[in-house]
Amino acid sequence: VTDTKERIDPYVWRVAIVVVLGSLMSVLDTTIVNVALETLHDRLHSPLSDIQWVITGYLLSLATVIPLTGWASRRFGAKKIYLVSLVLFTLGSALCGLASSTSELIVFRVLQGVGGGMILPVGQLILADTAGPKAMGRVVSVTGVPTMLGPILGPTIGGLILSTGSWRLIFYVNVPIGAIAILLALRILPASGLAAKPPRLDLRGLALMATGLPLLTYGLAEIGITGGFSSGKVLIPLLASAILIPAFVWHALGRKAPLLDLRLYRQGTYASASLVLFFLGAALFGAIILLPLYFQQVRGESVIDTGLLLGPQGLGMALMMPFVGRMVDKVGGGPLAFIGVAVTLVAGVPLALIGAHTSLVWLGFVQFVRGIGIGFAFMPAFVAALAALERQQLPDASPQLNVLMRVGGSIGTAVLAVVLERAILAAGHAPSAAGVAAAYGTALWWSIGISAAALGPCVWLTLAERSARRARREDADAAGGPLEPPLVEAAL
């Protein structure tokens, strides 16, 4: 087992700062805009059905470009793609702030999403490659902080901006941050090597994935808006995606250089870790809609106060992230992820028993514990997935993991939104605060069920890691050489 106290090159931490800055800007923007829909509806004099496309258009552009990041990084170099993504996101933010109509705002949000979709996966790729296997866990875990904190801090920051200034500031705030990130990236990020023989773009795979994934995203988003599955806006895109995505899988498995190399899932550690991340994405990003709505609708809290009340969960996650990287090499990613999911489940029960007058102090404590569990579960699984692969496979792995987490989040959000709406309807025509609180409790029980689904993949991940260690010992014994540390252990 490697020495976890081995000093990491300060240059690696400088690269991490650049990556975290870009990632935080991208993740925060999504949740900041979410709280501004009502304001945009009033100021732009457009129906909410049109304003909703400010979010939907952004999500669709994200879903379209994420699968492209692996090929683009190989073809042009990860540093260039990261810089392009920062420029597009910053430019899109400035144009959004200048928009004079809803249609202009939607178009500029799509441009912003093209950049935002590449920032996180390419940043993770750069950081994993720069850190190397021995420091990967400790360094890559840092990139998980903005992903975890974004949904918590976004509503608070958005509420503060909207209460003190123009809605345009929620977009302008990205411009100086983006400019700083671009300058730091130019100065600090390492030059990326190009593939000796850059692969040709898989146009057929791109056509299938660039239509199937956005259609799936759109259909799932419409479930949350319409409150059911019977609408044509839900059924048509979901049915189309049910044809296009399997067609992409069939195509990718039969092609030598597909847009996304799905053969990575033949590796047990990577496949099991990916499943853990899928269910965690569904549980985390799905449940994140419930407590803010509870605080505002049942407890009558403002947007700013709601963000502060959600803070303990973000604090718990942030405190755990730096430490789990040092722990995985001792116990493996699977056991840590299992413990994290178990803690999340235990902390979820008091939330599911929530009432109209439950102590805010108690809710804060429970959220803090839940945040610790999420921090324990999320990053060990992510590091285990990356560390199980060869260096040349990382450009394929990072976008795939991001796609899985986003699709999981979309599914979780859609399911919990439907459960919540039907539970509120079941409470009667004019339900009391206690009745509405009970409806949120019902949805939170469903969230617990989604989290519990991650336990099986955690066990599989544990067994896969043990199998990989055993195989390496046998190979080392057969070769008569020293034992090489397992990749997941060496990663930390």
Stretches with model-predicted labels:
Residues 222-228:
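Short, hydrophobic transmembrane alpha-helix segments
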Residues 190-207, 255-259, 467-479:
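Flexible cytoplasmic inter-helical loops of multi-pass small-molecule transporters
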